[in-house]
Amino acid sequence: MPVTIIAEAGVNHNGSLEMAKEMARVAKECGADIVKYQTAVPELVVSKFAEKAEYQKQTTDAAESQLEMIRKLHFSFEAHKELKEYCDSIGIQYLSAPFDVPSVKFLSTMGLPLLKIPSGEITNLPYLEVMAAQKTPVLLPTGMSTLDEITDALGVLDDGGCPEVTILHCNTQY
């Protein structure tokens, strides 16, 4: 299997579609095969009562909530479609990690050849069942996981009919 280079864009575009496109362009110029973003419905993954981490308070508006900050960083589904079209036009594969079930289902409508499970979702077995049901190959990061958690996740994906799982060994420090 050839090496595949994935450029991690995440939400580092700060909610700017133009910056996200620029990140894709630069990733392509640097030789990346794939550029990966994040897709989420913020209200489904962040509590309105969640506080920001101290470093976030120091580097962003300390008065806004975690949810308000996350809302600014995530694109609408329509913006993700535009971003994928841009990636296609410059010859780099678009990839996104969906953080909730509606985002999984949305990305599945885009005809992507691959989905990435977010690192923190490896123990969310109902979420993994939905991912498997999409019948799309997935990337499974394991940086925060025990061997038993990885085994359980692989079992759910296999039982659900996921056609291919690529395990990513990640050194993670969140």
PLM region descriptions:
Residues 1-14, 54, 58-67, 81-82:
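N-terminal small/glycine-rich loop or linker at the start of catalytic domains
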Residues 5-9, 35-37, 94-97, 113-117, ...:
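Hydrophobic faces of well-ordered beta-strands that scaffold small-molecule active sites
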Residues 33-74:
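Glycine-rich, proline-tolerant flexible connector loops at the mouths of alpha/beta enzymes
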